[in-house]
């Protein structure tokens, strides 16, 4: 059966029209309000939509959310969910604490084809894309948990598409999910509160204008193609200069800016020459530089730099006119930090 969460408002209306259900668009809007405004799990009842629509949906669609297999809580209040879909495939989703509010770090694929060498997910390979409904239900599950267990911090969470997978490699399903997240009849989430992270998957990046006006984060990680290709093998196909040129062509409106993500790996990309070349290619660009200390995982060949070396790298950027922040690591004690998601890890 098709998940009700896989439908956009338009496709749900068409779905009901095929069976001559009365007032299909009105019924579709009521279903959307039920799922996303009221966030109720389960089918609607007679009086909300027609009996014919109820009977048809009962035979053709599922109103079930994905199954939560486990929930882990970090000492810093990060929360990691292991979520299972109807075919038995699993992903991890993370609630990340910020002052006054949380963000939900959502996965877009089971595994990932990019095989970035700093990322535990990359060792899993790609098993399949997630559907738009599987992307959406991660958010609903995390928000419901937040309301139950941390109600004082349960304001509508932000979204970061930074979990398992490359979002732009699963473009169509991510696009459908985003349209529901921001739509008036859907979750009504402001576009400024959604950030999509990419390793630089150029075919999807060139279509970025088709998406709602969300924020974008580029996994940069080195200003040199030779080193970046070692960290992100995708760079061999889509080199950095092509990615930056494409990003420069994206019309960022208002005060939106790109987030440049830079994982600091000791002895590989945290040298003085790395900082100086990074400043050279980013000077004058409208963006924010997030320096992310490498987070270890079983089998990793990299090391995390010392606090002193990270501060020195930041200082060089600052002296060259580049504002950069060092991101605070969250959830590393439960393997929920950047680059650590992989549900096959024992104990997840």
Regions found by a protein language model. Give the residues of each.
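Canonical Radical SAM [4Fe-4S] cluster-binding loop centered on the CxxxCxxC motif
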Residues: 97-143
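Short beta->alpha linker loops
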Residues: 130, 200, 329-333
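Conserved AdoMet/S-adenosylmethionine-binding subsite of the radical SAM
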Residues: 144-324
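A short loop-to-beta-strand scaffold at the N-terminal edge of the catalytic core in hydrolase folds
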Residues: 90-95
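Exposed loop/turn and edge beta-strand positions of beta-sandwich/beta-sheet ligand-binding modules
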Residues: 77, 102, 155-158
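Auxiliary Fe-S-binding modules of radical SAM enzymes
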Residues: 1-89, 151, 248-256, 262-348
């Amino acid at each position: 059966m098709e998940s009700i969460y896989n439908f956009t408002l338009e496709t749900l209306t068409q779905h009901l029209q095929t069976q001559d259900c009365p007032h299909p668009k009105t019924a579709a809007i009521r279903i959307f309000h039920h799922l996303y405004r009221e966030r109720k799990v389960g089918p609607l009842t007679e009086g909300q939509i027609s009996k014919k629509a109820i009977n048809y949906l009962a035979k053709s669609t599922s109103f079930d959310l994905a199954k939560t297999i486990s929930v882990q809580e970090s000492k810093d209040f990060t929360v990691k969910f292991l979520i299972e879909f109807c075919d038995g495939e699993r992903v991890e989703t993370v609630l990340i604490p910020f002052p006054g509010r949380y963000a939900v770090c959502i996965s877009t694929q089971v595994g990932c084809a990019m095989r970035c060498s700093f990322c535990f997910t990359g060792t899993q390979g790609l098993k399949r894309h997630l559907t738009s409904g599987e992307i959406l239900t991660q958010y609903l599950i995390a928000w419901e948990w937040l309301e139950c267990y941390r109600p004082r911090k349960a304001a509508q969470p932000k979204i970061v598409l930074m979990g398992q997978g490359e979002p732009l490699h699963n473009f169509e399903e991510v696009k459908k999910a985003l349209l529901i997240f921001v739509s008036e009849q859907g979750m009504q989430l402001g576009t400024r509160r959604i950030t999509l992270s990419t390793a630089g998957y150029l075919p999807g990046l060139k279509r970025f204008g088709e998406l709602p006006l969300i924020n974008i984060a580029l996994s940069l990680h080195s200003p040199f193609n030779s080193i970046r290709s070692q960290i992100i093998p995708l760079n061999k196909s889509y080199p950095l200069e092509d990615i930056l040129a494409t990003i420069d062509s994206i019309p960022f409106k208002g005060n939106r800016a790109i987030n440049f993500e830079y994982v600091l790996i000791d002895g590989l990309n945290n040298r003085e020459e790395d900082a100086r070349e990074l400043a050279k290619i980013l000077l004058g660009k409208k963006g924010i530089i997030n320096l992310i200390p490498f987070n270890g995982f079983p089998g990793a060949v990299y090391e995390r730099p010392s606090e002193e070396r990270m501060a020195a790298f930041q200082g060089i950027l600052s002296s060259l006119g580049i504002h950069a922040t060092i991101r605070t690591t969250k959830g590393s004690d439960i393997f929920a930090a950047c680059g650590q998601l992989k549900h096959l890890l024992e104990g997840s």
